């Protein structure tokens, strides 16, 4: 029955039935922490002592017999019985027994618990004993105690006295007790004297002899012996407390005489006193034990005797053991058995024990009890006995010979015939019978025992010339290698030649001989080479067999190893060290196996030495890629050293690699190592104080603000730690989900197999089990891989082939056990595992009955490994049955969908969704999938299903469900887009609109019933034609949203926050599910644990900024400030930090839970997990944590007032952002009344918002008058004031004061640009020097101004400025290299010379970023430009000249390749010189990776110019593909890509998700070049062609009909367009089968398409025909190619283009059922709005492009470039972004425009 169902059933019964009875019954079905806690809670509230005792007895019984219960009880709240339930004597006894077994749970009792304990005697005593808390903290009244309580009290008091010696207050209390207290006083007071008669036997250990009047030294003999072993007041031997001192040393002989004859005293003395551990004492004790067996403690003393091999004591032990063997009585056997665990096991001792046990086993075979005891001993100590196997088998076989001889002699004496075969005579196949007694003794199967030990048996039989063994040729051949091994080990190698084996025979048995020899430590390669040739070559040639044999010996006969297995592996590595592929692919699985399996028997140092040795054979890049599987065994220091990490990003890459390792190490181990590395990087270990948690918080927060790349990487780490469920996730939990993957990638069970053939299934299985291998089941994995490879006919990938090659010849074996058929597959009470098991058995048997035997052979091992493996097999089998027409699987699905509300295991429902995806959605009904998706809250699956259903029928209720799903995944653009679909929004549409606006009060009113015509209330939902299933009831779903977002909850929490203003400790009572409020609770926790209040407030301010200065959070922080201020006012005599120390101390006393130290104690950041918490980065004028972080400032707050001031300013900005002018003015007025003049700046910004520029200037002037020039606020105000004045004088005056403001220089430069270009150029340069954020706009302007200068004086001045700029900021120039390079063609010689110097410096310092881009000028058609480049190249250093020469040679070869006319090409045959050029010290274009080689394959594309795709192999081992193009000018494409990179940088500053898909373009000349190849791209035409062809429709044929007219025209348009019904959306379903990846890909497509539409409109990009727009099948991204038709050139074509961008019916169709509404329109508007805000940057970066003399528009007329720039400006003048987007969309989709487009543009698809 379903576990959750049972648990809920028992929890319900607990409410009405006797809890102990219900619990007893529940334990027979399940063990649940929830039930245990519920029972404990009831027991705490109940007063019935009998029922409590009954419950505790049940606990004790289950603790003994149920391991799971032990673990669950440990984690439960059972300690509440101690702290909240009064105990009696019986319950005390049983609960004490529970604590003895389970251990105490670490808690610090609060005041109320302390008070409870003081009033309940038994609880108090148990707490003291269980928690070892023996501090004197309560003066109990002992006079009222009964006898039992008094004895308990005395025991407790003695423990308290021991822990509180010399405590005067305790001594005074003891004196008041109504009992004999002399012993207690003697313990507490060292100077207290006591009579010897009052001391008990155990009391002598707790007092000094000097305290005792009339003491006898013999009385303290044991105390003296314990004091010899005392450490920290405890005896190391017996564990007694030894508090006394000053004992007199006793004489050894006197002591021996005194204990003579007393075995117990002798054993006590031996265990405590080394002087008496003599052979004589050993003999005495052994004699005494064999005469009169003593208690177990007497035997334990034998462990202290130093028994050495061949020593006197060993001889003594052997003498007694031989005596026992000779008598062999049961008593002697018993004594020997008791001695066995405590005697040192030398080989002779172990063998003697074997003789006793084995002979006893045979002699007393009828005594089953004794036989079982002996067998248990032999089994537990098998490894020890196996260590002396040679002695054992020699003894046994000699005994067999003697026995057989005796039998034969008796037969002869009795006159038997000699011709009769003797019963002792055995053939090879009868050896099992011969060794039957021995195999039974070791509890092994006979044949297996003989087979595993033949290594010893055969050489002994051979050496003894075993008389009753008939030679068997096959037996001899199979086992003679054991004889050879034996001869090697005995050093009798010369005898091997005498046996008569040939060299080939010896060579064949080499593996069988060498592995046992290596295991026995035989490494004489010189000797072995005589028989097997070069040993290392032999190992290399037979590596798979070697590894297999080594593992087989290790698993089956681990006792054969005389040396560490790692030493043997080292020998193997030495043999194959030159072959990295073998080292990793062949060897690593076995290395990994031994790493895990050899955990206990091998020390850590041994492993480390081996790992270092093994890893030394890998190059650094290979190590970083692969050694994350070894890193968990290393410390952080070694990981850093081996990986050669140089930055935080490198560390994060390693951490991500660690967390990505699957199947190799436990996830806990990987996460622990990841945390260790994170602590090393961000925990400031350099301070010398270990890990500093507050520093960690601060470091992560600062880096988070500074770097987007850091946010992405640290977010990835956080996501993976969260997936692992590791506690370490809290370390970086502040990272928003905006920077995390919202869902893990699809599992293998979600992979779509297009054709369910055996080979297709096998390919998935092989990849799955190679990369997710469990070392614990390694052999099973290897067996499955081996068997699965038989079904794969074609080749695998190169990487896969390297890995699986070793399994193509292995011989792993597993005996298949047929599964039993089942009738019923599913019941609603089934667990997921049981469901899968029954489904697998049913479907496998159905397949077996059919004709699909090949599938059966492949899938019959599905139940051998984990659940995921079984699930994949079930999916495959179900698909086969569904395709064969089986209806039982569909019936099962229907039953599951109908039982969703009755407790179905969610994993079963999830399986149905996986099956739906696995079968491409062909068999299961959409309605069933929809119900299951909503039940599981799998909104991505629901969205995919709903859109599929809406495409069939556009029902409003389906749109309602779709709107709910989009709201649930926080895709608010689409939520609002659905509202735009309907002309008249429904109440449901309004509901979601209000929810998006966070107006939950208005949303709730949408759910209220509305009155009907007769006053009767009607439901607000619409179109209720039938009762929908509960999980699809929109009204219920909407109510759930409201329940989670109650305004009442907000109000309640805000009111609760007010309580902390009077009592800060009230923060611990705050609770909320709201992310903002959880953030605030975490802030309070930070404050409560702070050691430096001001530093903590600084961190809190940073956290608040990261959360976007949320309004509710700001209000909560106001309460926090009030709370801190009230505490400071109450303790005004103390400093802030001193007050906090007091606060921290008070909290510790008031906290129940223990605050553990270390990384796992402070969950600083986990409240930032909601994407709603994060907004776009704050504006740069913000004075706060972010600005200080970006500027590198480390100064924080110096007072609480500063924190409060920043808080008020943030509130004002928040109101201003919401246009709440009234409240904004109110807050500003409040701060002005308090003379907080910093608010004047915010007042000025408010004035600007209202259009009151004059008032804004006045406010800013006041700021400038009040604040010093050094303050940040003064600088901000001055910049803003100058910007509002916008005059040359204002900027000049401001710059005379503020000489380091990049923004001010940038603003001023624009003002001077038209009149004073030299001054403007200087200001632009200064803007970049002081703030590199200005470089995107300033650098292009600098070079444009310089190139436009005409007077020589201006040119000379500009040259000086550029020289200064180059010296200070050359590192910023590589991204603008193409813009700078184009100036080399400048007609002015002086300008060109200056540019040449800059180009030279860039080429010299940044060769990898400039050489490839320089080719266009080196091959220029303009002689002067070419000559200038030659001059630049001649000045380069020799190394750079060589590298550039190689780049040029490579480009020439690539040009030759592009010109080839052949249809098929290979490098080796057609371009052998090119293939041999590498390595040439040249980087792959656009990377830092060196080209190490080139692939042989060259792909030729069948188009007009026949471009070729080639592949470079990088030094990092990766492939880099490039397309070589001929007769194609790529210069404009290259410059267009430069612009796209600038746009991407703008997008990144505003949002983390928007981007343009770019690729590298490297022109070599005006007619050739290379383009970076992006794999997986398909053109719109190719995609549509595929789907229309399925319906028999041809795009090409349709287009050909209109070639003559070159366009369709309005008359034919509608007929043609209606024929091509949109199909593009199907491509997303087929390319991205998983619903999550499908939605992500479609969002990527929509967003990238919208962004490129705005870019294309702005740039006047035309020629967007169906083959120039491509789509990535890996991500869904849009990629545009052939970007040379720009600046409105499309309107000048023979058939002018009439649309701003392509928005045909297939394009719109693929946006989803919402069409243009939602994501597309939002992305379009926001991108256009971004362009409007950054038009200066965009136009600046187009200046060099437009004014480049190489392009045709510059050659037409000198005024053309200026007109292009003016047109670009005018495009963005006085625009309303959304209105303009509507106009553009209308133009792009207008039929009248589309019908007039050129037919080759394919406007109809």
UniProtKB/Swiss-Prot annotation:
Residue ranges for the region (Disordered) are: 406-425
Q: Which gene encodes it?
A: MEC1
SMART domains the UniProt entry points to:
FATC, PI3Kc
Q: Which residues form the FAT domain?
A: 928-1420
Say if the entry is tagged with keyword Transcription. Answer: no
For this chain's UniProt record, which GO biological process terms are given?
A: chromatin organization; DNA damage checkpoint signaling; DNA repair; meiotic cell cycle; telomere maintenance
Q: What class of enzyme is it?
A: transferase
Outline the segment boundaries, as ranges, of region: Catalytic loop.
Answer: 1660-1668
Q: Is the DNA damage keyword given for this protein? A: yes
CDD domains from the entry? PIKKc_ATR
Q: What is this protein called?
A: Probable serine/threonine-protein kinase MEC1 homolog
- Gene Ontology CC entries for this record: chromosome; nucleus
């Amino acid at each position: 029955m379903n576990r959750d169902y049972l648990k809920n059933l028992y929890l319900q019964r607990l409410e009405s039935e006797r809890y102990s009875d219900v619990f007893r019954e529940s334990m027979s079905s399940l063990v649940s922490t929830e039930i245990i806690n519920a029972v404990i809670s009831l027991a705490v509230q109940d007063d019935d002592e009998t029922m409590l005792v009954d419950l505790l007895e049940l606990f004790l019984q289950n603790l003994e017999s149920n391991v799971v219960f032990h673990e669950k009880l440990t984690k439960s709240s059972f300690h509440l019985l101690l702290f909240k339930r009064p105990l009696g004597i019986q319950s005390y006894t049983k609960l004490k027994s529970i604590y003895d077994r389970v251990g105490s749970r670490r808690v610090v009792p609060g005041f109320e618990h302390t008070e409870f304990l003081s009033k309940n005697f038994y609880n108090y005593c148990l707490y003291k004993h269980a928690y070892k808390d023996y501090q004197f903290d309560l003066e109990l009244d002992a006079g009222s105690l009964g006898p039992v309580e008094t004895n308990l009290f005395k025991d407790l008091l003695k423990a308290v006295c021991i822990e509180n010696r010399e405590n005067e207050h305790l001594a005074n209390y003891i004196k008041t007790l109504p009992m004999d207290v002399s012993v207690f006083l003697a313990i507490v007071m060292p100077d207290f004297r006591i009579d010897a008669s009052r001391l008990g036997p155990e009391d002598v250990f707790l007092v000094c002899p000097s305290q005792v009047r009339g003491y006898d030294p013999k009385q303290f003999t044991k105390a003296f012996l314990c004091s010899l072993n005392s450490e920290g007041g405890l005896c190391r031997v017996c564990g007694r407390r030894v508090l006394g001192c000053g004992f007199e040393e006793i004489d050894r002989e006197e002591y021996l005489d005194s204990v003579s004859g007393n075995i117990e005293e002798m054993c006590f003395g031996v265990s405590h006193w080394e002087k008496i551990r003599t052979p004589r004492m050993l003999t005495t004790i052994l004699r005494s034990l064999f005469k009169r067996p003593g208690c177990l403690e007497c035997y334990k003393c034998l462990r202290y005797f130093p028994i050495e091999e061949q020593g006197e004591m060993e001889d003594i032990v052997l003498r007694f053991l031989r005596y026992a063997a000779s008598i062999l009585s049961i008593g002697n056997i018993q004594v020997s058995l008791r001695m066995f665990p405590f005697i040192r096991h030398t080989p002779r001792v172990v063998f003697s024990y074997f003789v006793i046990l084995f002979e006893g086993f045979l002699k007393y075979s009828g005594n089953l009890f004794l036989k079982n005891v002996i067998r248990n001993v032999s089994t537990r100590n098998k490894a020890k006995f196996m260590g002396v196997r040679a002695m054992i088998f020699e003894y046994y076989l000699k005994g067999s010979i003697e026995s057989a001889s005796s039998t034969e002699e008796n037969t002869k004496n009795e006159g038997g015939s000699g011709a009769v075969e003797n019963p002792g005579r055995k053939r090879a196949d009868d050896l099992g019978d011969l060794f039957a007694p021995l195999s039974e003794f070791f509890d092994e199967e006979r044949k297996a025992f003989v087979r595993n030990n033949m290594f010893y048996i055969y050489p002994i039989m051979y050496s003894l010339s075993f008389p009753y063994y008939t030679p068997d040729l096959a037996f001899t051949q199979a086992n003679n290698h054991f004889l050879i091994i034996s001869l090697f080990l005995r050093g009798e190698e010369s005898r091997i030649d005498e046996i008569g084996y040939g060299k080939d025979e010896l060579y064949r048995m080499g593996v069988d001989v060498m592995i046992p020899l290596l295991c026995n430590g035989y490494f004489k390669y010189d000797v072995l080479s005589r028989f097997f040739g070069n040993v290392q070559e032999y190992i290399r040639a037979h590596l798979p067999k070697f590894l297999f044999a080594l593992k087989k010996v290790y698993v089956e006969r681990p006792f054969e190893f005389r040396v560490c297995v790692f030493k043997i592996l080292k020998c193997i590595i030495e043999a194959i060290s030159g072959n990295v592929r073998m080292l990793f692919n062949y060897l690593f699985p076995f290395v990994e196996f031994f790493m895990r399996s050899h955990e206990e028997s091998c020390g850590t140092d041994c492993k480390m030495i081996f790992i270092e040795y093994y890893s030394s054979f890998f190059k650094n890049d290979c190590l970083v890629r692969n050694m994350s599987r070894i890193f968990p065994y290393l410390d952080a220091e070694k990981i850093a050293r081996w990986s050669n990490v140089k930055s935080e990003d490198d560390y994060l890459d390693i951490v991500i690699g660690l967390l990505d390792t699957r199947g190799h190490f436990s996830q806990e181990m990987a996460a622990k190592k990841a945390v260790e590395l994170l602590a090393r990087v961000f925990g400031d270990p350099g301070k010398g104080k270990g890990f500093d948690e507050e520093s960690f918080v601060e470091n992560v927060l600062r880096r988070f603000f500074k770097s987007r790349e850091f946010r992405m990487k640290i977010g990835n780490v956080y996501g993976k730690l969260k997936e692992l469920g590791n506690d370490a996730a809290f370390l970086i939990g502040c990272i928003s989900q905006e920077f995390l993957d919202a869902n893990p990638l699809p599992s293998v069970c979600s992979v779509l197999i297009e054709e369910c053939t055996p080979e297709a299934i096998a390919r998935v299985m092989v990849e799955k089990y190679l990369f997710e291998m469990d070392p614990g089941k390694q052999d099973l994995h290897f067996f499955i891989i081996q068997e699965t490879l038989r079904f794969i006919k074609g080749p695998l990938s190169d990487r896969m082939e390297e890995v699986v090659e070793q399994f193509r010849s292995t011989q792993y074996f597993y005996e298949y056990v047929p599964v039993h058929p089942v009738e019923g597959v599913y019941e609603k009470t089934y667990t997921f595992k049981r469901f899968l098991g029954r489904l697998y058995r049913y479907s496998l048997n159905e397949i077996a009955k059919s004709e699909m035997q090949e599938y059966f052979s492949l899938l019959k091992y599905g139940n051998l490994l984990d659940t995921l493996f079984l699930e994949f097999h079930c999916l495959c089998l179900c698909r086969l049955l569904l395709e064969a027409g089986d209806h039982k699987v569909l019936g099962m699905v229907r039953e599951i969908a109908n039982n969703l509300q009755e407790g179905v295991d969610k994993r079963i429902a999830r399986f149905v969704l996986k099956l739906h995806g696995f079968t491409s959605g062909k068999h299961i009904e959409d309605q069933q999938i929809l119900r299951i998706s909503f039940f599981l809250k799998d909104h991505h699956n629901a969205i995919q299903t709903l859109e599929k259903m809406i495409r069939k029928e556009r029902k409003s209720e389906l749109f309602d469900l779709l709107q709910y799903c989009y709201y649930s995944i926080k895709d608010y653009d689409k939520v609002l887009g659905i509202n735009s679909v309907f002309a008249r929004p429904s109440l449901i549409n309004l509901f979601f609109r209000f929810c998006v606006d966070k107006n939950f009060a208005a949303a709730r009113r949408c759910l209220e019933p509305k009155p009907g015509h007769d006053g009767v209330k009607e439901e607000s939902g619409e179109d209720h034609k039938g009762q929908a299933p509960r999980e699809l009831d929109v009204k219920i779903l909407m109510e759930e949203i409201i329940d989670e977002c109650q305004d009442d909850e907000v109000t309640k929490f805000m009111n609760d926050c007010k309580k902390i203003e009077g009592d800060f400790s009230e923060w611990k009572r705050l609770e909320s599910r709201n992310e903002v409020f959880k953030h605030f609770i975490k802030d309070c926790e930070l404050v409560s644990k702070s050691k430096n209040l001001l530093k903590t407030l600084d961190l809190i301010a940073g956290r608040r900024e990261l959360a976007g200065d949320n309004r509710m959070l700001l209000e909560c922080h106001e309460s926090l400030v009030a709370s801190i201020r009230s505490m400071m006012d109450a303790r005004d005599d103390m400093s802030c930090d001193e007050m906090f120390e007091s606060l921290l101390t008070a909290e510790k006393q008031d906290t129940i839970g223990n605050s553990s130290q270390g990384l796992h104690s402070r969950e600083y950041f986990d409240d930032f997990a909601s994407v709603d918490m994060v907004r776009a980065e704050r504006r740069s004028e913000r004075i706060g944590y972010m600005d200080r972080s970006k500027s590198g400032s480390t100064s924080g707050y110096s007072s609480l007032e500063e924190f409060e001031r920043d808080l008020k300013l943030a509130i004002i900005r928040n109101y201003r952002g919401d246009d709440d002018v009234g409240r904004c003015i109110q807050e500003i007025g409040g701060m002005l009344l308090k003379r907080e003049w910093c608010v004047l700046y915010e007042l000025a910004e408010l004035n600007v918002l209202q259009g009151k520029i004059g008032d804004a200037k006045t406010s800013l002037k006041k700021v400038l008058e009040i604040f010093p020039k050094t303050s940040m606020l003064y600088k901000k105000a001055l910049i803003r004031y100058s910007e509002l004045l916008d005059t040359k004088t204002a900027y000049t005056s401001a710059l005379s004061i503020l000489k380091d403001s990049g923004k001010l220089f940038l603003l001023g430069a624009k003002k001077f640009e038209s009149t004073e270009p030299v001054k403007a150029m200087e200001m632009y340069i200064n803007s970049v020097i002081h703030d590199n954020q200005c470089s995107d706009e300033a650098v292009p302007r600098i070079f444009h101004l310089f190139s436009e200068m005409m007077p020589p004086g201006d040119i000379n001045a500009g040259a000086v400025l550029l020289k200064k700029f180059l010296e200070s900021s050359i590192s910023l120039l590589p991204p603008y290299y193409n813009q700078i390079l184009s100036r080399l063609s400048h007609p002015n010689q002086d300008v060109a010379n200056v540019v040449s110097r800059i180009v030279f410096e860039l080429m010299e310092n940044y060769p990898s970023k400039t050489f490839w881009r320089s080719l266009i000028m080196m091959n220029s058609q303009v002689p002067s430009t070419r000559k200038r480049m030659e001059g630049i190249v001649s000045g380069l250093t020799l190394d750079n000249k060589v590298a550039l020469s190689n780049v040029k040679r490579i480009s020439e070869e690539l040009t030759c390749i592009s010109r080839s006319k052949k249809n098929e090409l290979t490098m080796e045959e057609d371009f052998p010189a090119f293939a041999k050029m590498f390595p040439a010290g040249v980087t792959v274009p656009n990377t830092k990776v060196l080209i190490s080689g080139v692939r042989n394959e060259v792909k030729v594309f069948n188009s007009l110019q026949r471009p070729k795709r080639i592949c470079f192999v990088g030094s990092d081992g990766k492939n880099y593909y490039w397309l070589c193009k001929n007769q194609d000018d790529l210069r404009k494409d290259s410059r267009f890509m430069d612009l796209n990179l600038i746009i991407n940088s703008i997008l990144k500053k505003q949002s983390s998700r928007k981007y343009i898909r770019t690729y590298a373009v490297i022109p070599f000349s005006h007619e050739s070049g290379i383009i970076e190849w992006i794999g997986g791209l398909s053109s719109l035409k190719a995609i549509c062609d595929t789907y229309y062809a399925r319906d028999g429709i041809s795009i090409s044929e349709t287009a050909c009909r209109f070639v003559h007219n070159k366009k369709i025209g309005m008359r034919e348009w509608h007929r043609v367009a209606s024929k091509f019904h949109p199909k593009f959306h199907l491509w997303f379903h087929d390319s991205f089968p998983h619903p999550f990846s499908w939605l992500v890909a479609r969002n990527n497509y929509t967003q990238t398409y919208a962004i490129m539409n705005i870019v294309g409109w702005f740039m006047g990009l035309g020629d967007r025909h169906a083959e120039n727009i491509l789509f990535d099948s890996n991500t869904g991204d849009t990629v545009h190619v052939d970007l040379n038709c720009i600046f409105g050139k499309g309107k000048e074509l023979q058939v002018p283009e009439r649309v701003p961008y392509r928005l045909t019916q297939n394009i719109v169709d693929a946006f989803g059922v919402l069409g243009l509404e939602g994501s597309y329109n939002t992305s379009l508007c926001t991108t256009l709005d971004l362009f409007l805000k950054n038009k200066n940057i965009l136009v600046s970066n187009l200046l060099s492009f437009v004014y480049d003399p190489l392009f045709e528009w510059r050659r037409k007329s000198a005024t053309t470039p200026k007109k292009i720039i003016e047109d670009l400006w005018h495009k963005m003048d006085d625009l309303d972004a959304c209105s303009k987007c509507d106009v553009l969309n209308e133009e792009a989709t207008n039929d009248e425009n589309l019908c007039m487009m050129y037919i080759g543009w394919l406007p109809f698809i």
